[in-house]
């Protein structure tokens, strides 16, 4: 695979940097967005949650003024100082008394620090909290919870005496109060002076309690002294985006009760003077600047409004806490300043005003100066680092540092590789062959060892290796977190722990150090220490170990290198035995005799070096491959022992390497083949769709990183080959960190955890990727396990989430998934666990005993559901019933009597039917009502229409049967029904609309002797309108279509009225005689086939008076309207008039069985 480049994509490491700096010091801090209302909290660490007792979900989106921590002993002056720092986007350090969730009070030191983006604009605030002491004073009220109203005990005590906290920082300024009091105007209305009352009575409002609108007005007054542009810049942020004048999402009842005149603000804040304003303290960006400031600290005179930005005593260093300010240091010109004098006119021996003026500079001026406390600088400045900026930052590379994947480093590595190969070849050769020649005096006696050409090359190689060691001290590396480390100190430590010792030993020129000592054997042995450089080959060539061709080439080179080393050893053995051997039987003597260059009696002469090396290499290759011919044979015992070792090595190498070359290549090449296949597909996709270069780079980088993260393993494909029990165990192991440390999953049974683990999916996101877009359906719940993300609404950051945070929507509150109200974008490389809502609900349904615990302990850090898209945020029943109503609200009638209630013994037949609404025994066997029609073909029930109001008129005719009294819990048919009733009526509605009144006439025919229908009194109200169709609502038919339908209905009603008037006498006779007769065939549209006998229950009725033509005319209208098809614009106008044919003797029919006519819709 290619070299590991690490995380080289630009990342927003703001949150990680803050956590790294603060968490190591056990800091407690929150991060607030300066661009949203009330400077809402978008992040809080675990230390702050432990300090205040609130969970992260309870703190998120609250005002960063921490009004929910206020209590009876919270100083309003201190709260005003925090608000002033937030309004002025300045750094401040305030001591204030806060209350925990359990009611305990503690004195806290708050550091307010602004954070800038790359443009220099303040977009966030960091508030660091440091506990000074636990407040336990005499007469202190009992522990009081912050979320309830103030008790009468401490309210009464607060009115009795004034509470004054002796702040050490403010007491130190008492000596400087006199010049300010004498030099200031004594009236509250003096220009530039603001009266601040020190009385801290918590109950009654006082002049000390200045709301934010008063502060804005005060800014207006002072800003009038400067240019118009400065005045607008000063007043704009305070008036447009107030910090405390608008209640936050979690208003504190106690804070509102403490300050009733704050215009709805959750806490009454005022701009007051902080203790750090007494002298101008220069901003330091590192610890070195702090020391320099300490050494050169001098008392400064009081400032005035005319003091400019380039004061002679002001330091030339830019007061900066971010990289952008340091870059713009030389471009800053003179900055106009506006000052306010905060004067205390009440004589107070404990609290005093400072002697200097407080500078308030317009927040729009980016290159402004601030007064920075030394504590803030120590907290935020560690070494040479400065406060990070909230922006995408590429990995910071230290100066004079070489990237490990840079082209220079790649060329240098190849050069070092060639030098290592040279060392591996020539070091054994020179130790075995050349030293003996030097010892024999083949070279000139006055020419030293340095005159040899190979010695000069060895010297150059040694120098190159020493230079490589120095380069390794400046080369970046990738740590375990896939981060590129460029800090020289960390690089040196990493190199010392790794390969430094081996590289150092291999780079020592031993032959030069012991040159002239006369021990050539020792030199030859020490020269072999350079073979340690072969470890470099293993390191450099490891990245090519997955390529089949490279592996084959490396195996061949390894085999040749081992043969070369063995040849040098073979020559060394023969050369060592040759002078001490009386009988010339060694392989060197045999070689000299064979080629005609024998050794003389003095041992000189013999074959040349070339002949010796080639013969030795020939013998080792033939022995390693077991194909030796015997022309070079071992004769002495030493030679035979070495030959045995060579044969053993050769057999192992031949069997393990050459015999399995194909298997090795296939095994090593399988992963690489998959990688290159996938990469080829990605590149073909990029080429085919012409993806632009920035997006192409992101695709390739994500693929490479995802491959290194998963190693090309498809987890789903792997798990499919195992049984479900083993899959659950594997998933439980992979998600063990989430299931063990996340609070909602604690207490779950092993089976529940296994079921949940099977449903979780892991998502890996690079920086800059958007996980959820605004408007997307929220189909899953997300748990962050690594990295940080931001949530944006438009371009405004509303939350920054980190490890162990949860975002999504509360699934138990909504039956249908909602839509996201913002974009979720990754700031760094993130790992998230997500579970789909259907899967989660399915598991919780299987384990109901765990469901209640899960929903009660689940704290979603940020709720992404957009409640504005659905007006009123309806419940699931409203959503489902509303969805059904949209399909059925085609046509509706106004059928309601003047009386809202009916008699106790009556059941409405034209309303919803019986008082019990919903499916019952009488409607389960009827698919679409009593006449077999589908629910969507006829008009909807009165409850299914939202258009009908209290003033709708009613039908003049109502036919109701007498029945038993209703149960107490049932509602009458004329009263509005609940949402459940609406939902049930949509499912099964046998007596739907006005049509049900006519259907009841034929439903109760049979052996019901003595049962009569009665006519209700007619309503004096005007005739009702038949249709209630809002033409202007979306999705309705056009006006012309509705008018054409009305004309067709009118014609149909006229025909039906004519038919019914002709058949009325016969119908009344049938009803009075209570005989089973065939109902009249009045349908003029379609004649259905014969159907099953009706099984509707028969209800007793009372006597019915004679029906009039007008009353039955109303019934005919409803019948005609019910028979109208849903999609037919016109109805048939002509057709034969069908009349009822009665037998001659009606009395004989009473004993005959019921035979329904084929045209009867109820058949």
Curated annotation (Swiss-Prot):
Belongs to the potassium channel family. H (Eag) (TC 1.A.1.20) subfamily. Kv11.1/KCNH2 sub-subfamily. Residues 1-405, 474-497, 544-549, 662-1163 are cytoplasmic. Phosphorylated on serine and threonine residues. Phosphorylation by PKA inhibits ion conduction. Keywords: Cell membrane, Coiled coil, Glycoprotein, Ion channel, Ion transport, Membrane, Methylation, Phosphoprotein, Potassium, Potassium channel, Potassium transport, Transmembrane, Transmembrane helix, Transport, Voltage-gated channel. SUPFAM superfamilies: cAMP-binding domain-like, PYP-like sensor domain (PAS domain), Voltage-gated potassium channels. One of its GO terms (biological process) is potassium ion transport. Residues 254-271 have a biased composition (Polar residues). GO terms for molecular function: delayed rectifier potassium channel activity; identical protein binding; inward rectifier potassium channel activity; monoatomic ion channel activity; potassium channel activity; protein homodimerization activity; protein-containing complex binding; scaffold protein binding. It holds the Pfam family cNMP_binding. GO terms for cellular component: cell surface; inward rectifier potassium channel complex; perinuclear region of cytoplasm; plasma membrane; voltage-gated potassium channel complex. Changing residue 630 to S: Dominant negative mutant; abolishes ERG current. This is Voltage-gated inwardly rectifying potassium channel KCNH2. CDD domains: CAP_ED, PAS. It comes from Rattus norvegicus (Rat). Pore-forming (alpha) subunit of voltage-gated inwardly rectifying potassium channel. Characterized by unusual gating kinetics by producing relatively small outward currents during membrane depolarization and large inward currents during subsequent repolarization which reflect a rapid inactivation during depolarization and quick recovery from inactivation but slow deactivation (closing) during repolarization. Channel properties are modulated by cAMP and subunit assembly. Residues 1039-1066 form a coiled coil. Residues 427-452, 519-522, 571-613, 635-640 are extracellular. It comes from the Eukaryota. It is found in: Cell membrane. It is a multi-pass membrane protein. The modification Omega-N-methylarginine is found at residue 1018. Residues 744-844 are annotated as: cNMP-binding domain.
């Amino acid at each position: 695979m290619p070299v590991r480049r690490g995380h080289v994509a630009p990342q927003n490491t703001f949150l990680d940097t803050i956590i790294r700096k603060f968490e190591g010091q056990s800091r407690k801090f929150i991060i607030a967005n300066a661009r949203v209302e009330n400077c809402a909290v978008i992040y809080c660490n675990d230390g702050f949650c432990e300090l205040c007792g609130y969970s992260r979900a309870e703190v998120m989106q609250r005002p960063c003024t921490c009004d929910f921590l206020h209590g009876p002993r919270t100083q309003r002056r201190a709260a005003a100082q925090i608000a002033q720092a937030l309004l002025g986007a300045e750094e401040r350090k305030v001591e204030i008394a806060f209350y925990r969730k359990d009611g305990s009070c503690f004195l806290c030191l708050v550091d307010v620090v602004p954070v800038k983006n790359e443009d220099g604009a303040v977009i966030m605030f960091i508030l660091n909290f440091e506990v000074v002491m636990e407040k336990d004073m005499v007469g202190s009220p009992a522990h009081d919870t912050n979320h309830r109203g103030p008790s009468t005990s401490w309210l009464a005590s607060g009115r009795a005496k004034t509470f004054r906290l002796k702040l050490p920082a403010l007491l130190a300024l008492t000596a400087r109060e006199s010049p300010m009091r004498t030099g200031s105007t004594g009236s509250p209305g003096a220009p530039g002076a603001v009266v601040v009352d020190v009385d801290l009575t918590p109950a009654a409002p006082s002049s000390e309690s200045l709301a934010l609108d008063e502060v804005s007005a005060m800014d207006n007054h002072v800003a009038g002294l400067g240019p118009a542009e400065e005045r607008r810049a000063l007043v704009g942020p305070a008036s447009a985006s107030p910090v405390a004048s608008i209640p936050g999402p979690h208003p504190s009842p106690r804070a509102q009760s403490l300050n009733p005149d704050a215009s709805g603000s959750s806490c009454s804040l005022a701009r007051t003077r902080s203790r750090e304003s007494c002298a101008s303290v220069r901003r330091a960006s590192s610890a070195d600047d702090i020391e320099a400031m300490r050494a050169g600290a001098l008392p400064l005179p009081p400032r005035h409004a005319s003091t400019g930005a380039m004061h002679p005593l002001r330091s030339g260093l830019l007061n900066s806490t971010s990289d952008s300010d340091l870059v713009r240091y030389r471009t800053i010109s003179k900055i106009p300043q506006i000052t306010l004098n905060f004067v205390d006119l009440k004589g107070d021996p404990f609290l005093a005003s400072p002697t200097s003026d407080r500078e308030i500079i317009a927040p729009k001026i980016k290159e402004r100066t601030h007064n920075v406390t030394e504590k803030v600088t120590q907290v935020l400045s560690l070494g040479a680092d400065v406060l990070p900026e909230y922006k995408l930052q590429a990995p910071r590379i230290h100066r004079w540092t070489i990237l490990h994947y840079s082209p220079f480093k790649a060329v240098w590595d190849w050069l070092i590789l060639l030098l290592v190969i040279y060392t591996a070849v020539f070091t054994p050769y020179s130790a075995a062959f050349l030293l003996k020649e030097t010892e024999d005096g083949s070279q000139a006696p006055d020419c030293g060892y340095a005159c040899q050409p190979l010695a000069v090359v060895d010297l150059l190689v040694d120098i190159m290796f020493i230079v490589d060691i120095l380069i390794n001290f400046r080369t970046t590396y990738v740590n375990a977190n896939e981060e590129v480390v460029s800090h020289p100190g960390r690089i040196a430590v990493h190199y010392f722990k790794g390969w430094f010792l081996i590289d150092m030993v291999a780079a020592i020129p031993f032959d030069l150090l012991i040159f002239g000592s006369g021990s050539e054997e020792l030199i030859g042995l020490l020269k072999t220490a350079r073979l340690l450089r072969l470890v470099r080959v293993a390191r450099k060539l490891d990245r090519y170990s997955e390529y089949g061709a490279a592996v084959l080439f490396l195996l061949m080179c390894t085999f040749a290198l081992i043969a070369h080393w063995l040849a040098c050893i073979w020559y060394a053995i023969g050369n060592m035995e040759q002078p001490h051997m009386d009988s010339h039987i060694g392989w060197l003597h045999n070689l000299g005799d064979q080629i005609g260059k024998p050794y003389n009696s003095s041992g000189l002469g013999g074959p040349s070096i070339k002949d010796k090396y080639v013969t030795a290499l020939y013998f080792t290759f033939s022995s390693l491959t077991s194909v030796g011919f015997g022309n070079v044979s071992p004769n002495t015992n030493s030679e035979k022992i070495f030959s045995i070792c060579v044969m053993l090595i050769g057999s192992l190498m031949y069997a393990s390497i050459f015999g399995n070359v194909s298997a090795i290549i296939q095994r090593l090449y399988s992963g690489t083949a998959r990688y290159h296949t996938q990469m080829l597909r990605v590149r073909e996709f990029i080429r085919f769709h012409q993806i632009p270069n920035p997006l192409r780079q992101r695709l390739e980088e994500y693929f490479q990183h995802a491959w290194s993260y998963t190693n090309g393993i498809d987890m789903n494909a792997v798990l499919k080959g195992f049984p479900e029990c083993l899959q659950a165990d594997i998933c439980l192991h992979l998600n063990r960190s989430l299931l063990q440390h996340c609070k909602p999953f604690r207490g779950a049974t092993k089976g529940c955890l296994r079921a949940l683990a099977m449903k979780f999916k892991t998502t890996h996101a690079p920086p800059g990727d958007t996980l959820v877009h605004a408007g997307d359906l929220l189909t899953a719940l997300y748990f962050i396990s690594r990295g940080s993300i931001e949530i944006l609404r438009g371009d405004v950051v509303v939350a920054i989430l980190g490890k162990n945070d949860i975002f999504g929507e509360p699934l138990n509150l909504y039956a249908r998934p909602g839509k996201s109200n913002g974009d979720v974008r990754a700031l760094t490389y993130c790992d998230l666990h997500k579970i789909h809502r259907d899967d989660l609900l399915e598991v919780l349904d299987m384990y109901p005993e765990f469901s209640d615990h899960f929903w009660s302990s689940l704290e979603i850090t940020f709720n992404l559901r957009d409640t504005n898209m659905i007006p009123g945020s309806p419940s699931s029943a409203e959503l489902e019933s509303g969805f059904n109503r949209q399909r059925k609200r085609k046509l509706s009638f106004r059928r309601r009597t003047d009386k809202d209630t009916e008699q106790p013994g009556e059941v409405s037949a034209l309303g919803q039917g019986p008082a019990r609404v919903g499916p019952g025994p009488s409607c389960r066997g009827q698919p679409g009502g009593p006449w077999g029609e589908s629910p969507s073909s006829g008009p909807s029930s009165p409850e299914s229409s939202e258009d009908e109001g209290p003033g709708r008129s009613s039908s003049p005719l109502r036919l109701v049967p007498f029945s038993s009294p209703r149960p107490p819990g049932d509602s009458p048919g004329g009263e509005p029904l609940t949402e459940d009733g609406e939902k049930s009526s949509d499912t099964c509605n046998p007596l739907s609309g006005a049509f049900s009144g006519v259907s009841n006439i034929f439903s109760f025919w049979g052996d019901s002797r003595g049962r009569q229908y009665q006519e209700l009194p007619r309503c004096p109200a005007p005739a009702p309108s038949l249709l209630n169709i809002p033409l202007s609502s979306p999705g309705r038919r056009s006006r012309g279509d509705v008018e054409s339908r009305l004309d067709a209905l009118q014609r149909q009603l006229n025909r039906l009225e004519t038919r019914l008037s002709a058949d009325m006498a016969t119908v009344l006779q049938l009803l009075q005689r209570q005989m089973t007769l065939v109902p009249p065939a009045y349908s003029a549209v379609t004649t259905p086939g014969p159907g099953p006998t009706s099984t509707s229950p028969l209800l007793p009725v009372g006597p019915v008076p004679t029906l009039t033509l007008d009353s039955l005319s109303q019934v005919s209208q409803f019948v005609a309207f019910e028979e109208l098809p849903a999609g037919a614009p016109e109805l048939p106008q002509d057709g034969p008039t069908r009349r009822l044919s009665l037998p001659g003797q009606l009395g004989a029919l009473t004993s005959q069985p019921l035979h329904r006519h084929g045209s009867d819709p109820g058949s």
